[in-house]
Design a protein with these regions (language model features):
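Amphipathic alpha-helical
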Residues: 118, 122-135, 142, 248-252, ...
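Long, highly charged, low-complexity intrinsically disordered interaction regions
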Residues: 1-84, 89-91, 100-107, 241, ...
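Charged catalytic cores and adjacent phosphate/nucleic-acid-binding surfaces used
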Residues: 149-163, 167-284, 290-304, 315-345, ...
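Solvent-exposed, charged amphipathic helical/linker segments at domain boundaries
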Residues: 107-118
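Active-site catalytic microenvironments in core metabolic enzymes, especially phosphate/sugar-handling
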Residues: 350-353, 480
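Active-site nucleotide-donor binding segment shared across nucleotidyl transfer reactions
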Residues: 125-166
């Protein structure tokens, strides 16, 4: 039964209840359900039953609050809301309930087969240590998507200098992993935590396998087709020297196009986490963050950063205790006091202003003018056609007070597709209006997608790697943004948050001058 048929049955039930004088509220509920089912992006018949009842301990009333009041429609969105402390703002959702939901959802997601990079990164060291203990360190090499710093990992891959026949008995233990697949030259296991482990095996072409599996299928096929007679029994550097092209680091070995680029240009020194000089886009307990502004500023300074951009939610984000005009004035006064108190460091006044349905921002120009930085983001009515999304975003980009375009598509990896946009038109508009594009470093966002950053760099649009931190610990997410930026060949000169304090202030002043709002 498809969604249309399910919707038809709900609609019929609603009409029959009206005819028989049943409770009008119940009848209307079925009519509303019919509308929503018919407009679902995925077929309900394809949704596993366990997905509907995945979160134990949440009754119908809480589900109603989550869906109707919080406007949350997927497990991933709910997890993200918990991580941002949003559930605690609603009646019946305490800290314990919120943590229970996080634990249950993470367990569920771990069994779906795909993982975010940091989830795999957390367990990879133990797996590496285990394999090295079995086969010795010189015979084990990590490879594949994880080595390329992919944002989503389906399998953790290793090259092991041994044969299938010798490896399989070594995996027999009290809790052996499940052998899912065996092929000549590879074994695929499923670990107890649900993660799939692929081992590329064999001793004859061991060193070649280390290199060829480090790239995507497209990259490797193009490399092998173009460069024959390569001696793979050497380092990666030697392999590229033999091919007479510039060295390509593993994170860039995704497409054939990078090979053509490496023939003519030297790959620049890619941005590193240590290049980040300031925290841009952070939330305090004035909205939905966990820490005070002072706590966040002192922590940022202790970590070696030169400045902090506090970008609490705007007034339309009622679910996140968005700031009214009065609260903005009070916060700005408080920031002034902190800047006098904390020396050798600066806090910048900012806001994450909601892009409304018509593309306008949710404050008057006189209020927007009081901020050092305005991050414009979409948080509501995410189910848009490309035409609607483009109209909304382009108008926000054209607003002279927009400094940074936040999380461009609104996606949540493994949970929610972003709304459809024409990336090139968005980037062109940012270039024309002197708007910086955020690379939201939260590992569940990583938005703008790194695949579109190259075009932004061609158009001289600055990228800003921002943690979207709701806690002090959230500062650490910067690293995941850097890993994504490296895949787009971003240098520190092309990233706003790499600017030192003076350079950052100068950049903000220049942008405002170009926009005519200084």
């Amino acid at each position: 039964m498809d969604n249309y048929q399910i919707a038809e049955n709900f609609s019929l039930l609603s009409k029959l209840m009206d005819i028989h004088g049943e409770n009008s509220f119940k009848a209307k509920t079925y009519a509303i359900a019919a509308y929503h089912v018919e407009n679902l992006p995925e077929q309900l018949s394809n949704t596993p039953q366990e997905k509907i009842s995945v979160i134990k301990g949440i009754g119908p009333k809480k589900i109603h609050t989550i869906w109707k009041e919080m406007e949350i429609e997927s497990v991933g969105e709910l997890l993200y809301a918990c991580q941002e402390n949003r559930l605690k703002l609603y009646k019946g959702f305490g800290e314990k309930t919120q943590q229970n939901i996080i634990d249950t959802i993470e367990y569920y997601l771990h069994n779906q087969g795909s993982y975010l990079y940091p989830q795999v990164e957390e367990v990879a060291p133990q797996i590496i240590a285990y394999l090295e203990k079995l086969f010795s360190a010189e015979n084990v090499f990590i490879t594949g998507a994880f080595k390329r710093q992919a944002e989503i990992i389906d399998e953790l891959e290793f090259v092991v200098n041994s044969t299938n026949e010798l490896i399989k008995p070594r995996f027999v233990s009290a809790n052996p992993p499940e052998l899912l697949e065996e092929k000549p030259g590879s074994l695929l296991y499923k670990l107890l935590n649900g993660l799939r482990l692929r081992l590329y095996t064999g001793t004859e072409n061991f060193k070649k396998s280390v290199f060829t599996t480090s790239g995507s299928a497209e990259f490797t096929a193009a490399f092998e087709q173009q460069f024959t007679g390569i001696d793979y029994n050497n380092s990666d550097i030697s392999i590229f020297e033999q091919a007479k092209i510039n060295f390509i680091p593993p994170c860039l070995r995704e497409t054939a196009a990078i090979i053509e680029k490496a023939k003519s240009i030297k790959i620049p020194h890619l941005i590193q986490a240590c290049d980040i000089k300031g925290i841009i886009h952070s939330h305090s307990n004035w909205s939905d963050g966990s820490n005070t502004i002072e706590e966040m500023a002192k922590a940022a300074k202790e970590k070696g950063f030169e400045y902090l951009v506090i970008s609490d939610h705007s007034k339309s984000a009622f679910y996140a205790q968005g700031l009214s005009e009065e609260k903005i004035a009070a916060q700005h006064q408080y920031v002034n006091e902190l800047n006098e108190k904390i020396t050798g460091f600066k806090i910048f006044k900012s806001i994450e202003s909601d892009i409304l349905n018509d593309g306008s921002l949710d404050y008057s120009n006189s209020i927007l003018a009081t901020f050092d930085v305005v991050i414009a983001s979409v948080h509501s009515n995410l189910k848009m056609s490309e035409e609607k999304a483009m109209l909304r975003l382009l108008k926000a980009i054209e607003n002279p007070y927009t400094t940074i375009l936040g999380h461009l598509t609104g996606r949540l990896l493994l949970s929610r597709k972003g709304y459809p946009v024409d990336h090139k038109k968005i980037i062109d508009a940012c270039a024309a209006n002197h708007v910086i594009i955020e690379l939201n470093a939260h590992p569940r966002r990583l938005d703008i997608d790194w695949r579109h950053i190259d075009y932004a760099l061609q158009k001289n649009v600055l990228i800003s790697i921002n943690p979207d931190a709701h806690t002090i610990e959230g500062f650490e997410d910067i690293r995941y943004g850097v890993l994504a930026a490296q895949k787009a060949m971003v240098t520190k000169e092309q990233n706003l948050s790499s600017f030192g304090l003076k350079e950052f202030e100068d950049c903000l002043g220049k942008v405002k001058e170009l926009k005519g709002v200084r």
